[in-house]
Amino acid sequence: MKFTLSWLKDHLETDEPLDRLAEKLTMIGLEVENIEDKAKALKPFTIARVISAEQHPNADRLRVCMVDTGDGGAPVQVVCGAPNARAGLVSVFSAPGTYIPGKDITLGVGTIRGVESRGMLCSAAELQISNDHDGIMELPADAPIGAAYAEWAALGDPVVEINLTPNRQDCTGVHGIARDLAAADMGKFKDPTIKPVKGEFPCPVKVTVEDATLCPGFALRLVRGVKNGPSPEWLQKRLTAIGLRPINALVDITNFMTYDRARPLHVFDARKVKGNLVVRRARDGETLLALDGRTYNLDPATCVIADEHGVESLAGIMGGEASGCDENTTDVLIESALWNEINIAQTGRKLGINSDARYRFERGVDPAFMVPGLELATKLVMEMCGGAPSENVVVGKAFGDDRVIDFPVTEVKRLSGIEVPQPEMKRILTHLGFMMAGPGPVVKVAVPSWRTDVHGKADIVEEIVRIYGVDKVPMTPFERGDDARKPVLTPLQLRTRRARRALASRGIIEAVTWSFITKSAAKLFGGGQRELEVANPIASDLSDMRPTLLAGLIAAAQANADRGFGDVALFEVGQVFKGDRPQDQFMAASGVRRGFASSEGLGRHWSGSVQADLFDAKADALAVLAAAGAPMQALQIVAGGPGWLHPGRSGTIQIGPQNVLGYFGEMHPRALEALGADGPLMVFEVILDRVPEAKKRPTRAKPLIELSAFQPVSRDFAFIVDRTVKAGDIVRAAQGVDKKLITGVNVFDVYEGKGIDDGKKSIAIAVTIQPREKTLTDQEIEAVAAKVVAEVTKKTGGTLRA
């Protein structure tokens, strides 16, 4: 929600400085996200006159201009490429050292094609006050040379942007924001009575509402004989300041009412509407060319406004092109209605339309302001466009529901810990539009029609506390007896913490992604079941609970790549959902590596760059399992993985055939294509819930490390085995010979080719033998070696390579 300071002061009589108002807005729950002060940003830019503009000696499209900057000094030489640069032109000048916001550069003295340039003549786009970049700005001939441009152009009206929570629909208009500030002692609220505009004739257009649940109320008025042209300068500046494009007076009035009073309206060109209007559900096969230039396919779930020819408007979301108002409009129908919030939200998400009207209607508008909003809009139309108004046509209810809450004043202390005097409670609630009656400990509080979010006692406490001051809430620690146990993390919480630390220590950056993903992505990763669909998704592309963390991480990696950061390693630890039962929800640790983001380091390097591969993903997964306390000696790594992984470049980590702990490998190209991501991409995912808990020990102390005083011995073995034999089987066989003496078995060579029979391969291992009690003799070492050969032969069918 954006507004200017002067706009706010139309509704709030205040002398408070902007920084004080911004601080108070945040304190009362209307968080200020940004304040844009163009006067401050454009302070260095001045008004200047071009004295002469000569052809550049070395460029056809450049001119060498001598510019009078108004400082009393000699003219300044500026090289300019604008087609409208000419002698006598008054424009905006920036001197060296000035920051140009539209180009994100700081200007310096430069030489352009051999000619020195000591400044710049600016376009409106370079000052970020419009998108016009076809030429430098042209100011009136009487503009004061040397004056500050921002001050002369009256740009000293800061634009404030606030972040609204979904329940504060009343503050989607400047009027509601001013009311809150007045209640917080920031000024006096201006709330003049809206006088009805007397109709001069009956409205010839009738309105029928077929389904009152979709449209509880509808008001309409015809104004004849209007002259629709550009809106007044004050209105155009106000709309431009908040990022809206002025179109014409009638359309600008509806946009102004939307932001000023949180009352979306719609105007129809009455001459383009055939017959009467009906509010109904769309019919199968109906379409609408909307004001955004797009054609939408409608269905019976969509509420529309139609005439005898068909659909004219998407109710509460966007009007149709066919009945839109332009400079030829002479008769206008002004519509002010109430719409079903849920239907508006569902229709907007389904059609992918995010309009200002939808933003307000799906949150709920003030039902009692439906008719007064129409009266105020009629008054503005007559002031700007003239015309004769008809009488109002009102269908349905034009008022809000009466809500009176029995409120014990002690609730404020009970829920917030603050002692607020009862007179102060009444003052706050009264300024917010509530009515409080009764002297006793339980009072009656009447809720105003515009506060559709207030339904109970806790809501009233919230209103009182946020205005009184959340900074006054005392810090009260929970009481805990002397014999109370200190908090202890669960095994899963410990694994989660250790997994994060392990991955961070490997140079991977933690990311937090949505728990919701698209239906197509969910199906790709084995999800997409009906029970995992979100009943009321916040966006059409966030419809399903995620069966994996990888969908979000891959999207995040691609987003980084699209912005020029292709070498990225990301991880996330969070919940995944295989079903809607508690036992179908798991804690997972997942990660992606892209480009040169290998375990050797990130990005390219002069000493050589290593592309991330599946062994990096494997090492990441094993690091997580080791940190989580998995029995590493019992892990089995099986080639292959889920269908979304490359079949020849992936693996599955398991303990036995039933307990699959995770996967790693390269994403399948088809899966990446379906996700709209570029490859190759290395990924892993470990399910922390499936890691077996370590056996409990009688003491928490770790056993002492046993260091041997004797020299270790290493022996190399090369075995010829079938091609299908896994290296891990050979390693486990060798380790099992003597677990006290053999402290390490590593694979250092795999060979297939000349000298090896077809269907066979050679795997070489290094076995480390660590004596504990004495130095081993050659005979003892050879005995261990013989056992290694025998055990590997027995378990794998391999033979010692000659």
Swiss-Prot record:
Species of origin: Bradyrhizobium diazoefficiens (strain JCM 10833 / BCRC 13528 / IAM 13628 / NBRC 14792 / USDA 110)
Phylogenetic placement of the source organism: Bacteria, Pseudomonadati, Pseudomonadota, Alphaproteobacteria, Hyphomicrobiales
SUPFAM superfamilies linked: Anticodon-binding domain of PheRS, Class II aaRS and biotin synthetases, Nucleic acid-binding proteins, PheT/TilS domain, Putative DNA-binding domain
All residue ranges annotated as the tRNA-binding domain in the record: 39-150
Domain FDX-ACB: start-end pairs: 708-801
One example of a Gene Ontology biological process annotation: phenylalanyl-tRNA aminoacylation
Gene coding for it: pheT
Alphabetized PANTHER family for the sequence: PHENYLALANINE--TRNA LIGASE BETA SUBUNIT, PHENYLALANYL-TRNA SYNTHETASE BETA CHAIN AND LEUCINE-RICH REPEAT-CONTAINING PROTEIN 47
Protein name per UniProt: Phenylalanine--tRNA ligase beta subunit
GO cellular component annotations of the record: phenylalanine-tRNA ligase complex
